């Protein structure tokens, strides 16, 4: 029996200001579906003991047989903010991680207000990690970094607490380096466009006379990076 009755979800649907669409993005096998199961368990839809085993949102038979997500699927969840008791309806979208189903990831990102970006702490930034981060960037979806499978650092690599801390710091820096690349690419494209426009305006008023010096405006990029201090 779900903790949140359907009538409560129906009531929340009438308050569109408190509805959020959130997609789960990651490289294949980094734990998207297990996380989705765990979030479903908070609403009593499945038992917490079955999280990661039942793969609830992998509703297709071939998904269950192959053990991978092939199609984006969603479900509505109830969330109550502890600070002010505000109630939200979260439309959670679990998306594929395999490169063959990247169109499903794009569709999920376009529908979303935010994204949970999962990274396996041992495997780190993989090909599809970069791809899903870029998809979130292109769609202007606000991402939250989720470092997953932390137990592997202790069980498999036998890390000490200080080693695990350093490893996670380095992993966050790797992800931020990817975001820095996106920022730089967009910045160069914007600067090139602005320079072309400035040259055109100069020709209109000065003809073929040499153009005076033109300076680029500095922009702060600190807001794009993941940082535990910022809560993202």
Predicted regions and their residues:
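Conserved C-terminal guanine-recognition region of P-loop GTPase G domains, centered on the G4
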Residues: 109, 114-220
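Glycine-rich, histidine-containing beta strand-loop boundary motifs that form or position
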Residues: 26, 37, 119, 145-149, ...
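Long, low-complexity, serine/threonine- and charged-residue-rich intrinsically disordered N-terminal tails
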Residues: 215-217, 222, 226-232
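Conserved nucleotide-binding/hydrolysis micro-motifs of P-loop NTPases
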Residues: 30, 42-45, 98-99, 122-125, ...
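P-loop NTPase switch module centered on the Walker A-proximal segment
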Residues: 1-119, 157, 166, 173-177
């Amino acid at each position: 029996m779900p903790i949140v009755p359907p009538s409560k979800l129906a009531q929340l649907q009438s308050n569109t200001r408190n509805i959020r669409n959130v997609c789960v993005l990651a490289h294949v096998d980094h734990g998207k579906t297990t996380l989705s199961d765990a979030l479903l368990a908070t609403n009593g839809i499945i038992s917490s003991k079955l999280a990661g085993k039942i793969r609830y949102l992998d509703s297709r038979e071939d998904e269950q047989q192959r053990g991978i997500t092939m199609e984006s699927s969603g479900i509505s969840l109830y969330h109550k903010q502890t600070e002010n008791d505000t109630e939200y309806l979260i439309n959670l979208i679990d998306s594929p991680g395999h490169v063959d189903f990247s169109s499903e990831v794009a569709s999920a990102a376009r529908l979303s207000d935010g994204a949970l970006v999962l990274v396996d702490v041992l495997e780190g930034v993989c090909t599809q990690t970069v791809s899903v981060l870029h998809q979130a960037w292109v769609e202007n979806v606000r991402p939250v970094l989720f470092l997953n499978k932390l137990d592997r650092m202790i069980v498999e690599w036998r890390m000490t607490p200080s080693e695990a801390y350093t490893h996670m710091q380095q992993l966050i820096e790797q992800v931020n380096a990817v975001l820095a690349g996106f920022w730089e690419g967009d910045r160069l494209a914007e600067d090139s466009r602005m320079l072309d426009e400035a040259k055109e305006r100069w020709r209109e008023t000065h003809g073929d006379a040499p153009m005076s010096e033109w300076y680029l405006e500095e922009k702060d990029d600190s807001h794009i990076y993941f940082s535990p201090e910022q809560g993202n």
